[in-house]
């Protein structure tokens, strides 16, 4: 018994050290990205400061004064909060007032969208894997793309919920409105994704047809409730902290890194679509028509599809 307890404690220590190591590596990489040559400030034409500390010491010129927006006029440091990547301790111990002030001044862009998509895709995949392990005892691959640990449905959901929550927050929408809109958006996302996969690729990753409360094959009332609850929590708790921690790009390294990630995601999604199209064509006996399709058949065969997308059913016919 003592040996078992000691082994568990040792395992927990190893896990803690690994997690801490990854966290430190991530922090180091994030700090490295924020260093280097700074991006030019779009409004004032001056270099954006790297930290909030240096941002507050930047002298104000007549040019910057004329470019001041209403948000920054009401709060002179709002602009600094937008362009600055805050120091790690300040982000961790941020207050609600700081986050709200930052959200009032920031502008959503491609930088935030890409980070949210990647984080949502990976976090959603991890949570689904854990959920399947706890509820069904299954340890199957639930990825949605041929390269990398990504589930694009969760990534798209994170982006949509953030964009919608951001606008609802600006309009001071009540909780019931946030809940209903989030439920509708989540249901539409599931319906469009499921219908598109079945219609164009004859593939199916999930079905609610066996549930008594299903609305369509891909939408059920219980999951609309979960989408609404998730959207409400996202709007009130997750979104403000996520956008505050992501910040806005201040260095060329950050801009280049996000551009490379974007190109990788485009290639990953494009290759996944190509693999699904060839899998559908192979099922009906259509041979490859060009060198690229031959290469896809050679490297992404039906065996690869089955092993990679273990929850995916192929050759499914749409119900009439």
Briefly describe each language-model feature range.
Residues 1-52, 69-320:
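Aromatic-rich, lipid-facing transmembrane alpha helices and their immediate juxtamembrane interface loops
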Residues 52-70:
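Low-complexity tandem-repeat tracts in intrinsically disordered regions
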């Amino acid at each position: 018994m003592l040996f078992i307890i000691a082994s568990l404690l040792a395992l927990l220590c190893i896990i803690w050290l690994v997690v801490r190591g990854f966290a430190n590596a991530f922090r180091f990489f994030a700090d490295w990205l924020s260093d280097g040559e700074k991006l030019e400030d779009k409004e004032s034409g001056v270099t954006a400061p790297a930290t909030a500390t240096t941002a507050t010491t930047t002298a104000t010129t007549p040019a910057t004064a004329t470019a001041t927006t209403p948000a920054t006029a009401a709060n002179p440091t709002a602009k600094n909060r937008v362009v600055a990547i805050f120091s790690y301790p300040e982000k961790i111990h941020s207050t609600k007032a700081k986050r709200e002030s930052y959200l009032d001044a920031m502008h959503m862009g491609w930088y935030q969208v890409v980070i949210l998509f990647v984080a949502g895709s990976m976090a959603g995949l991890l949570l689904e894997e854990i959920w399947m392990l706890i509820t069904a005892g299954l340890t199957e691959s639930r990825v949605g793309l041929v390269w990398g640990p990504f589930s694009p449905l969760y990534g798209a959901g994170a982006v949509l919920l953030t964009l919608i929550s951001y606008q609802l927050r600006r309009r001071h929408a009540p909780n019931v409105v946030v809940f209903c809109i989030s439920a509708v958006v989540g249901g539409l996302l599931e319906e469009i994704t499921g219908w598109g996969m079945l219609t164009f690729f004859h593939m199916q990753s999930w079905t609610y047809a066996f549930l008594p409360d299903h609305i369509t094959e891909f939408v059920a009332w219980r999951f609309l409730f979960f989408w609404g609850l998730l959207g409400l929590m996202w709007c009130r708790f997750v979104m403000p902290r996520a956008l505050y921690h992501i910040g806005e790009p201040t260095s060329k390294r950050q801009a280049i890194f996000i551009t490379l990630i974007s190109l990788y995601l485009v290639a990953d999604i494009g290759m996944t679509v190509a693999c699904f199209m060839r899998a559908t064509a192979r099922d009906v006996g259509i041979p490859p028509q060009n060198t690229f399709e031959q290469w896809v058949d050679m490297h992404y065969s039906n065996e690869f599809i089955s092993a990679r997308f273990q929850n995916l059913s192929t050759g499914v016919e749409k119900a009439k």
